[in-house]
Every structure is written in structure tokens, then in C-alpha cells.
Amino acid sequence: MNNFTIKETPIKDLVIIEPKVFGDERGFFQETYNKESFAELGLNMEFVQDNHSKSKKGVLRGLHFQTKNVQGKLVRVTRGAVYDVAVDLRTNSPTFGEWYGVLLTEKNKIMFYVPEGFAHGFLTLEDDTEFLYKCTNLYSPEHDSGLRWNDPTINIDWKFEEFNITEEDLTISDKDKVQQLFDKSSTY
């Protein structure tokens, strides 16, 4: 029996994964990754690095990708909530340059698989949000790259109004404030 179900998104290979959660008066139990179960669902990846971040409300991280040693990421929230976004950078894809976003929370327990060839970022919606991601390749500082979170060509709707966050409330790293623009990049 497979403890995961997949929901397709409008962008090929970018999927939402819903784990089966076993709950009772003690709490809950869930698998967050099972290589065999994922393979049954057509998800054949191998993870080599796990990352864990903690952020206050209004932190916007991204949009990150690596130009070589590209990373696929399986992401989830263990505390709090994020609006998670992926941008298709696969030049041969019919959805090249398109984005998709999903709400990940500690309550909904869903996971988002962002395959290799995508830029990735997220906006934290609560204080003390904890975010975990498994990566298919090691972090490579010399290949680290990104796109600007507010790139006018990609035009991501970060749903600030819906989440009661203003642009003035955002906390963004200096690096992410000056990432390249989509139509000026030659890195993908």
C-alpha cells in the first residue's frame, strides 16, 4: 500500500504530494519519503542533502537555482506556513517561464516536489516557520544563481493581500534583492 498520493499541477513534473497521516489521541504519524513508494508513483529521484530553515513571518527566500549540479527539491513545512513557488526554467518545456504556487502548512502536511530545472522560493506566512527540503544534488556555491522575486516578466502573484503581508513588511536578503531578471539571464 502506498502512503502517498500525487496531484498534478499545470506544469509537467511539478507535483504536490499528499502523505497519508495516521492520527489518534496521541498525535500523528506520517511517512515523509519512501524511495519505493515514490518510484511506484513515477518519482525516481535520489536525495543527497537535507536542509532546514526557520524564519519569521514575511521572509521571502528566492528564487534560487543552480546553473550546474542542478537540484530537485522535496519541500514541506513542519511548523507555520509558507506560500511556495516554482518557476519552470527548462528551455525546451512548453511552460518555460511559467510559475506555480502552493500553500504548505504544518496542518495540511502536503509536500511539493520541485524537479531539477526550476527556480524555487517561498514566502513565510507565520512567525517561527520551519521549512525542510531534501535535495537531489549538493549545494554548489560556485553555481548558485537566482531570479528576482518580483521579476516583471514572470509576474508572480505572491498573494500579499490574501496573506495580510505588504511589500514593506518583507524581509529579503541583500543577495535576493538584486538577483537577475528573467529576460536578462543566460544561465539556464
Residue ranges of each PLM-predicted region?
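Non-catalytic, conserved peripheral segments adjacent to functional cores
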Residues: M1-K107, E126-D128, C135-Y188
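Short beta-strand His + acidic residue motifs that chelate non-heme Fe in jelly-roll/DSBH
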Residues: F112, H120-L125, Y133
